[in-house]
Amino acid sequence: MVEVVRNKRPPRGLVPRLRRALAALMEELGVGDKGVTVILTGDRRLRALKREWWGEDEATDVLSFPHYEPGDPFVPPHLGDIWISLDTARRQAEARGASLEEEVLVLAAHGLWHLLGHDHQKEEDWEGFRRVQERILAL
């Protein structure tokens, strides 16, 4: 199940597509029976969260907060929360020549991949992120 919380108004049609595409991606990744919450908000909130949890005083596009430790034998019914800044997503979409809807889908897939225990500390770690980010756009 994909729950979407709107702290900032998204474009019309984004929320239903986000729910459908993220749920389909979760199914493909074998976690279709789990839940996630996506919070659509702005730069100010993401900056505050990043400062509180990472000690970095800057806005960002997406943050993931898992509700379990990846690698634990028990994966709870709710994987965690994905926070997306619509402000940063809009700027990134414009820079890439993409729509805001596409950028939010890419960020949601990126956040989900983090919730599943993946990181991108090294260049070779990015392959999985690229794969899920491309896949969600096709769903």
UniProtKB/Swiss-Prot annotation:
Positions annotated to bind Zn(2+): 110, 114, 120
UniProt family annotation: Belongs to the endoribonuclease YbeY family.
Co-factor remark: Binds 1 zinc ion.
Cell location: Cytoplasm
Domain of life of the native organism: Bacteria
Keyword Lipid metabolism (UniProt): no
Assigned EC number: 3.1.-.-
Its job: Single strand-specific metallo-endoribonuclease involved in late-stage 70S ribosome quality control and in maturation of the 3' terminus of the 16S rRNA.
Required co-factors: Zn(2+)
Pfam families tied to this protein: YbeY (PF02130)
Main location: cytoplasm
Chain's gene name: ybeY
Top EC class, one word: hydrolase
Protein name per its UniProtKB record: Endoribonuclease YbeY
Keyword Cytoplasm assigned: yes
GO cellular component: cytoplasm
GO molecular function: metalloendopeptidase activity; RNA endonuclease activity; zinc ion binding
PANTHER family recorded: ENDORIBONUCLEASE YBEY, CHLOROPLASTIC
